[in-house]
């Protein structure tokens, strides 16, 4: 096989692997939780050390809006599939527990009850830049 042909095969294989395996990158939010930037910055997922963004990460969807304190992470999620429930999830950082999807009203009530009513909310992209 000629050098040019071998080079073209290698180049094509490299391009295919690069497209299929967009490894993304992650930044620590708090505790063992990370914001994972995927698909060249078009999607953001919430993950921990043991979870990948495949399948929607920890919240079964993409992060739309996020806020955090030392004890809680508040996330508005967009489900990966249209039949799933849109809304908010709250992560208890210390207990490592995630709520079911809840309404914005319930999230605001828990935000206040948790003493986090003054924390700042960010779009996923803005949170990525802040982290």
Regions found by a protein language model. Give the residues of each.
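N-terminal export/targeting and maturation segments
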Residues: 19-66, 122-130
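Intrinsic disorder/low-complexity detector
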Residues: 6, 34, 50, 73, ...
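Short, intrinsically disordered low-complexity segments
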Residues: 4, 25-27, 41, 77, ...
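C-terminal partner/receptor-binding element of secreted or periplasmic proteins
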Residues: 95-131
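Sec-dependent bacterial lipoprotein signal peptides
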Residues: 1-19
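Mature extracytoplasmic domains of secretory-pathway proteins
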Residues: 47-94
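Compositionally biased amphipathic helical and low-complexity segments enriched in hydrophobic
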Residues: 7, 12-13, 30, 36, ...
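Hydrophobic alpha-helical segments, principally membrane-spanning helices and signal/leader peptides
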Residues: 2-3, 7, 54-55, 61, ...
């Amino acid at each position: 096989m000629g050098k040019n042909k071998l080079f073209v095969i290698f180049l094509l294989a490299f391009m295919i692997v690069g497209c299929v395996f967009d490894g993304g990158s992650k930044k620590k939010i708090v505790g063992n939780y990370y914001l994972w930037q995927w698909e060249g910055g078009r999607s953001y997922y919430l993950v921990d050390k043991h979870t990948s963004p495949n399948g929607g990460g920890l919240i079964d969807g993409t992060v739309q809006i996020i806020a955090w304190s030392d004890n809680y992470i508040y996330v508005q999620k967009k489900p990966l599939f249209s039949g799933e429930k849109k809304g908010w999830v709250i992560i208890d950082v210390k207990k490592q527990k995630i709520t079911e999807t809840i309404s914005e009203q319930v999230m605001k009530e828990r935000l206040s009850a948790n003493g986090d009513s003054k924390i700042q909310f960010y779009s996923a992209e803005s949170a990525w830049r802040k982290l």
